[in-house]
Amino acid sequence: MYLDHFVVQNFRNLKKLDIDFDPNVNIFIGKNAQGKTNLLEAIYFLALTRSHRTNSDKELIGFGGEYTNLLGHVRKSQVDLTLRVLITQKGKKVWINRVEQAKLSKYVGQLNAILFSPEDLELIKSAPALRRRFMDQEFGQINAEYLYFASKYRQVLLQKNNYLKQLAKGKTKDQVFLDVLSDQLAGIAAEVIFRRFKFLRYLSHYASDVYAHISLGGEKLAIAYHPSVSTIEADDTVEEIYQKILANFERNKAVEMRKGTTTSGPHRDDIEFKLDGKNAHLYASQGQQRSIALSVKLAEIQLVHQLTDEYPLLLLDDVMSELDHTRQSALLNYIHGKTQTFITTTDLEGISWEIIKKPRVYHMQSGKISFEKEN
């Protein structure tokens, strides 16, 4: 799939853009704070209806504006689509081929996009919250069921935590309703965890293959999922996971009532990256950690293709300068001829032109874009 036409209205500092993209490689060059990252964020938002930089959609509306409008024409192997997202102070709406969609889950997945930024290089050594966000964003865009259950889990978790706070403050003593919420949350959590195990098995397989090609040390990469409920195992059924979570909630009821928060569940789970069985966070060098992060991103591309039969868009936000020549070449060779790629950079120095063939180069300044050349 590829995005061949994109219209942006009032997205951060991008007042009005109307762009035709090359189906292969598009490079955006400009100084910092000119709008390059904002453009990639807009493409990402068109695909996933969420930003990788903020949890507040309102922040995306340009200064002094009342709304943000994104419109994209997407070409896929079997069909062409027109996608639209409208953001206002009241919320957001989405359309597929001019038909408004009542549920975001019906929209997300029509256009797949993988974003790779310098922050992703910190995936291995960052806090668990970033790795959980990684799972929710990447798995959610390729599976509507996961997106639904992850969203529902956040809603019920908030409801349960609010009720726990009331119990902690003595504003209510009704534990029956708490049990109802715990039962509901356990059922949804089981669906989320079951799917995380499934997707991580795929991702670990592909990432291991990629790492074997781009690393020089010969180590074997593996990705392990660690539920906060330690009794849960990778081959458990949804029902078995549900029963274990529910039992854990019951054991920890007094603690949760005292603390006013849910102490276990998908919102407390984590991923571990291992090299030859050792925790990469603790034992891998910085170079090895970067190779792991790169392998995971490239594996995502293969995972999306495996599950959707389409290659996703690849958004490389100022990441080329963070990769040495070996890793940059591995990245470009892997995606060559597969994905429509968008690259932001402050200059064209150091880019492996022997791999990138005839990219379309644009210049960005103060939120405006001009077609510069095909290199």
From Swiss-Prot:
Ribosomal protein listed as a keyword: no
Keyword tRNA processing in record: no
Principal location: cytoplasm
Keyword set, alphabetical order: ATP-binding, Cytoplasm, DNA damage, DNA repair, DNA replication, DNA-binding, Nucleotide-binding, SOS response
Gene3D superfamilies the record matches: P-loop containing nucleotide triphosphate hydrolases, RecF/RecN/SMC, N-terminal domain
Entry GO MF terms: ATP binding; single-stranded DNA binding
GO BP, one annotated term: double-strand break repair
InterPro entries attached to this UniProt entry: DNA-binding_RecF, DNA-binding_RecF_CS, P-loop_NTPase, RecF/RecN/SMC_N, RecF_2
Pfam families: SMC_N
Record: residues binding ATP: 30-37
Protein's cellular compartments: Cytoplasm
Gene Ontology terms: cellular component: cytoplasm
NCBIfam families cross-referenced by the UniProt entry: recf
Function: The RecF protein is involved in DNA metabolism; it is required for DNA replication and normal SOS inducibility. RecF binds preferentially to single-stranded, linear DNA. It also seems to bind ATP.
Family the UniProt entry places it in: Belongs to the RecF family.
PANTHER family named among the record's database cross-references: DNA REPLICATION AND REPAIR PROTEIN RECF
UniProt name for this protein: DNA replication and repair protein RecF
Organism: Lactobacillus helveticus (strain DPC 4571)
